[in-house]
């Protein structure tokens, strides 16, 4: 994911969503890369900052990331305390799952999913 403010974005994924920094790398062309992952997962998200490129503008509804949470109501309250209120939801799906969305830095949207009991 291209970002304009790498450290602010890394801080959000670490401090707000609880992801961990797996590694940092600077490419030969100067791109700064930070790989983050959820605990106990091999899946990684690559955050990329290109210092000599124009500012990134994320198109609305272009993409989003989704994370499963155990207790959406509790997690939403914690997010609100940190300055990230829900932007949509919570909504119960036909399957019984509950979903909600927050706006992350850089214009990306994060979906939170509490699976049906």
Describe these PLM feature segments.
Residues 1-42:
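Core segments of cupin and vicinal oxygen chelate
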